[in-house]
Amino acid sequence: MNILIQNRLIFLFLILWLWTGCATKPDFTAGEQPLDLTVRPEALPVRGSIWPGESASNMLFADKKARYINDIVTILINEASQGGNKATTNTSRDSDSAAGIDAFWGLDQSILSRNVNMGSKIKIGGSSSSTLKGTGNTTRGGQLKGTVTARVVRVLDNGNLVIEGRRQLTINEEDQYLIISGIIRPEDITTENCIFSQYIADARIVYAGKGIINDKMRPGWATRIVDWVWPF
């Protein structure tokens, strides 16, 4: 019987091992996607006019801020977040009850008189108490600083700019990606053509990577299988 159970366990682990071997590891390919190099179509000059149309290069009093598609702007990333939650529960309950019965299904009262400790009536009593105390506390924080140059990919009807920027860094076969996208207002751009990440609406900031270091941060497949199967 023990040999049969042992063989079943070996067969089960063999199936799990083959199943994990067939699984493919998802790769982080967000930084490898080709850039959208959409060029804004140039406005054709009006017949009989030499004005080529509005652009950043022919404005007499315009600065070099990003305004049009494919213009670039530098994003100063300085993100910090911190949150906490605390809960405390304290409950208590006590109850007592007592009852006396003169007659109980024709029980002979002489039985009570024979024992002085029982008294003259049938008595029923009980008490209960319960106490519950619980405390929970969680804290989480994160911080990200960096600089990345983004490109204007769309100009909205109200003049706001949709931007997208990516940076890929490879060191010793370890790839790191920094991706940022969102919507900015031209008036929030400084004279140095920079903008802080706090001024980006619908901001999406991704900082991730893949490589040996990233793989070592994850538990092995056997540990993950045991954690998934283990019910306790």
From Swiss-Prot:
Alphabetized GO MF terms: cytoskeletal motor activity
GO annotation, biological process: bacterial-type flagellum-dependent cell motility
Keywords, ordered alphabetically: Bacterial flagellum, Cell outer membrane, Lipoprotein, Membrane, Palmitate, Signal
Signal peptide start-end: 1-21
Pfam families tied to this protein: FlgH (PF02107)
Origin superkingdom: Bacteria
S-adenosyl-L-methionine listed as a keyword: no
Covalently attached lipid (N-palmitoyl cysteine), positions: C22
Keyword Phosphoprotein in record: no
Topology relative to the membrane: Lipid-anchor
Subcellular location: Cell outer membrane; Bacterial flagellum basal body
Lipid linkage positions (S-diacylglycerol cysteine): C22
Coiled-coil residue spans: none
Main location: membrane
GO cellular component: bacterial-type flagellum basal body, distal rod, L ring; cell outer membrane
InterPro entries, alphabetized: Flag_Lring
Family note: Belongs to the FlgH family.
Entries under HAMAP family matching the protein: FlgH
Subunit relationships: The basal body constitutes a major portion of the flagellar organelle and consists of four rings (L,P,S, and M) mounted on a central rod.
Function: Assembles around the rod to form the L-ring and probably protects the motor/basal body from shearing forces during rotation.
Protein name, entry field: Flagellar L-ring protein
Species classification: Bacteria, Pseudomonadati, Thermodesulfobacteriota, Syntrophia, Syntrophales
